[in-house]
Curated annotation (Swiss-Prot):
Mapped LRR repeat ranges: 107-126, 127-150, 151-174, 175-194, 195-220, 221-241, 242-272
Protein name in the entry: Mimecan
Lineage: Eukaryota, Metazoa, Chordata, Craniata, Vertebrata
GO MF annotations, alphabetized: growth factor activity
PROSITE patterns, alphabetized: LRR (PS51450)
């Protein structure tokens, strides 16, 4: 009887015991790994499209890349593009309101994000600046076009840049100066082809914040008129200046007048003997640098 009961229990229990199905562990790892591969490819592709100078700077590249990879489709589509449909922030390097477009051989000012405050477009092949280049960019505070081929700047190209404080047009091919925005503190036009007739009589008169004016290595025949009282540094070296009057820096009708802010005037390399114009410097704290005898 006991044998029959054991046999019955065994027969009844065995069918209920089945091997558990194998645990599927590989699938989640596979999909996760595959996602990493795709992300890595995007980062590498984005990295390769950046300028060489930006690639050398690992910090800027990684941060800028991360910001652009996180942007949604609507933000990317809103970015301004060049004729090649390549976003400016891939052609250049955009970071915290600054746009760096240096040494990439562009021939025109690239479309800029509306929040741009600082533009560095040095050492390119830009030949012309148009009114439309900055028509919608009112936040600019600094522009650097040094080392281009700029020959022409349309009238009013900078007229809407009411916040612009620093402008460099050094090492270009300008023969005349554009109308400058009112809040400039620094203007650099060294190493151009500017003659005195290319500067209007009141070009600097209303620039009451202008402290640094660089016009060295041009073709000026005389010192620009109506220089603002705010000037601290004036560079006119290596021009063709042949004459200075008592009203160039001072006021001939006011012997007590002193230019209190002027710290430096450079005039070396001009065909003029400064010793012949002593009265022209009577209001200055320091004599200009140049040839006296």
């Amino acid at each position: 009887m006991k044998t029959l009961q054991a046999t019955f229990f065994l027969v009844a229990f065995v069918p209920l015991v089945k091997p558990a199905p194998p645990i599927q562990q590989d699938s989640p790892k596979f999909y996760e790994y595959d996602t990493d591969i795709v992300t890595g490819s995007l980062i590498q592709q984005d990295y390769e499209m950046l300028p060489k100078d930006a690639i050398k700077d690992g910090t800027n590249v990684s941060l800028d890349t991360g910001l652009r990879l996180q942007a949604d489709d609507s933000e990317l589509s809103a970015r301004p593009t060049k004729d090649t449909n390549l976003p400016t922030c891939l052609l250049c390097v955009c970071l915290s309101g600054s746009v760096y477009c240096e040494e990439i051989d562009i021939e025109a000012v690239p479309p800029l994000p509306k929040e741009t405050a600082y533009l560095y477009a040095r050492f390119n092949k830009i030949k012309r600046i148009a009114v439309s280049d900055f028509a919608d960019i009112t936040t600019l505070r600094r522009i650097d076009f040094s080392g281009n081929m700029i020959e022409e700047i349309e009238d009013g190209a900078f007229s809407k840049l009411l916040l612009l404080e620093e402008l460099s047009l050094a090492e270009n091919r300008l023969v005349k100066l554009p109308v400058l925005p009112p809040k400039l503190t620094t203007f650099n036009a060294n190493q151009n082809r500017i003659k005195s007739r290319g500067i209007k009589n009141n070009a600097f008169k209303k620039l009451t914040n202008l402290a640094y004016l660089y016009l060295g290595h041009n073709a000026l025949e005389s010192v620009p008129l109506n220089l603002p009282e705010s000037l601290r540094i004036l560079h006119l070296q290596h021009n063709n200046i042949t004459t200075i009057t008592d009203d160039t820096f001072c006021k001939s009708n006011n012997t007590r007048y002193i230019r209190t802010r002027m710290d430096e005037i450079r005039m070396e390399g001009n065909p003029i003997l400064l010793a012949k114009h002593v009265n022209a410097f009577s209001c200055l704290k320091t004599l200009p640098v140049g040839t006296y005898y």
